Amino acid sequence: MAAKTKTLELEDNVFLLLEGNLKRIFATPIGYTTFREFQNVVFNCANGQQEIANFFFEMLINGKLTQELAPQQKQAAHSLIAEFMMPIRVAKDIHERGEFINFITSDMLTQQERCIFLNRLARVDGQEFLLMTDVQNTCHLIRHLLARLLEAQKNPVGEKNLQEIQEEITSLKNHFDELTKALQ
């Protein structure tokens, strides 16, 4: 971490201004535009000064004070970090990856001589979906997604991404081997 340098000169009311605007933003549910609203507030409170904007971003996203502050302002900064760092990080995740799957859970039911899976998918943005499958549909879905991974392997970026999850791919292979043995 870079050493803290001179004391950053900020207007006395800037932390109150930040706090009020952040409370307004987070008084409503977090959505795709929330992080952009946060960025606008930071730029407005920084009065167009990039150094101050960067300080606020580092402070509110990562919880770090990269420059010295006057004692009262330092206390106000820590208060803002404690109250708003986590909601800002969630807003950033939703802005960047809101439609990605965050969590999957499944329940299995037996119905008329068929296994039915109730698959619940939750996205990063909090939306949840129910996907009902049976054994045949589940196999079809796996085959489709596996074909997509094979397609990704033909792309340099996709190949790099697959290398990063090599252990998970090996785990999938082991599960397929276990299932194949059980069916023999």
Swiss-Prot record:
Gene3D superfamilies per the UniProt record, alphabetical: 1.20.58.1050, 6.10.250.1130
Pfam families: CT_584-like (PF17435)
InterPro entries, per the entry: CT_584-like
Family, per entry: Belongs to the chlamydial CPn_0803/CT_584/TC_0873 family.
Protein name: Protein CPn_0803/CP_1068/CPj0803/CpB0832
